[in-house]
């Protein structure tokens, strides 16, 4: 199966109403590549990915946000290790898992 491997810069943002969740929005061109992947349906239209932010690397999923973009949850342990939080602009590497 063809995959996606990209790097991009994004601002971290905190979900409204839930201070625990922090996300990065994938750029439209990267999101379009994820939307076009041939894959079996996953929960909530999610796509399994491996992510790099600074010296941290982890596996997670990206989720569609409306019809134009995917969002990436950035867990607290990663934000703490990298010294970043909502409002910071970060460089992210992302690739489809498996």
Language-model features: locations:
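Long, compositionally biased stretches
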Residues: 1-69, 86-89, 93-95
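Beta-strand/loop nucleic-acid-binding surfaces
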Residues: 72
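Short alpha-helix capping/helix-loop boundary micro-motifs
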Residues: 36-37, 75-80
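Conserved GTPase G-domain substructure that encodes guanine base recognition and part of the catalytic core
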Residues: 98
């Amino acid at each position: 199966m063809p995959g996606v491997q990209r790097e991009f810069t994004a601002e971290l943002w905190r979900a409204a109403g839930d201070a625990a969740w922090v996300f990065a929005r994938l750029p439209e061109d990267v999101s379009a590549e994820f939307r076009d992947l041939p894959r079996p349906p996953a929960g909530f239209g999610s796509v399994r990915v491996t992510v790099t932010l600074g010296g941290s690397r982890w596996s997670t999923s990206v989720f569609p946000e409306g019809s134009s973009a995917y969002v990436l949850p950035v867990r607290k342990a990663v934000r703490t290790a990298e010294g970043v939080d909502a409002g910071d602009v970060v460089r992210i590497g992302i690739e489809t898992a498996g």
